[in-house]
Curated annotation (Swiss-Prot):
Taxonomic lineage from the root: Bacteria, Bacillati, Bacillota, Bacilli, Lactobacillales
InterPro entries: Ribosomal_uL5 (IPR002132), Ribosomal_uL5_bac-type (IPR020930), Ribosomal_uL5_C (IPR031309), Ribosomal_uL5_CS (IPR020929), Ribosomal_uL5_dom_sf (IPR022803), Ribosomal_uL5_N (IPR031310)
Function, in words: This is one of the proteins that bind and probably mediate the attachment of the 5S RNA into the large ribosomal subunit, where it forms part of the central protuberance. In the 70S ribosome it contacts protein S13 of the 30S subunit (bridge B1b), connecting the 2 subunits; this bridge is implicated in subunit movement. Contacts the P site tRNA; the 5S rRNA and some of its associated proteins might help stabilize positioning of ribosome-bound tRNAs.
A GO biological process held by the record: translation
Entry's family note: Belongs to the universal ribosomal protein uL5 family.
Listed GO CC annotations: ribonucleoprotein complex; ribosome
Protein name: Large ribosomal subunit protein uL5
Gene3D superfamilies according to UniProt: 3.30.1440.10
């Protein structure tokens, strides 16, 4: 069964992008390739239990088991050794990606306190969008009573768009609530 967002992309969004940017075919229209969720747990160097909690929360949010990220090099100032676990990340593609994006747009982002839309300036110049979430409590899967520490996470939406303008149009059509 095709996700409603995926269906809307193929029936409405892709043709609209083709006409706006004058592509020759719908295959040229930018599409969302993957979504990467990253949660850095800097305190995991002192307390390994914090990393386990972050992994559990990311599993609940994304629906798949995260990869534990390790430090690339030692930094004495942070009491960090090379190879120490310092975070977790998940790469979502296909149906899970569309499910997550749908949930992010329609459920999670409206739950952010004092929400006035997301910044349209967070594109990287290559058509990818990065969104910082300050607290994991905005996701409906996270139980407020079971959380002992508020953690943020990064949401990176990787698109096949060549320019930020194309990516902005794609994400606006998908329904991302950009601030005016």
């Amino acid at each position: 069964m095709e996700n409603r967002l995926e269906e809307r992309y193929s029936k409405e969004i892709a043709p609209a992008l083709v006409s706006k940017f004058n592509y020759k075919s719908t295959m040229q229209a930018p599409k969302i390739e993957k979504i990467v969720l990253n949660m850095g747990v800097g305190d995991a160097t002192q307390n390994a239990k914090l990393l386990d909690e972050a992994v559990d929360e990311l599993t609940l949010i994304s629906g798949q088991h995260p990869l534990i990220t390790k430090a690339k090099k030692s930094i004495a100032g942070f009491r960090l050794r090379e190879g120490m676990p310092i975070g977790a990340k998940v790469t979502l593609r296909g149906e899970r990606m569309y499910d997550f994006l749908d949930k992010l747009i329609n459920v999670s982002l409206p739950r952010v306190r004092d929400f006035h839309g997301i910044s349209p300036k967070s594109f990287d110049g290559r058509g990818n969008y990065t969104l910082g979430v300050k607290e994991q409590l905005i996701f409906p899967e996270i139980d407020y009573d079971k959380v002992n520490r508020v953690r943020g996470l990064d949401v990176v939406i990787v698109t096949t768009a060549n320019t930020d303008e194309e990516a902005l149009e794609l994400l606006t059509q998908v329904g991302m609530p950009f601030a005016k």
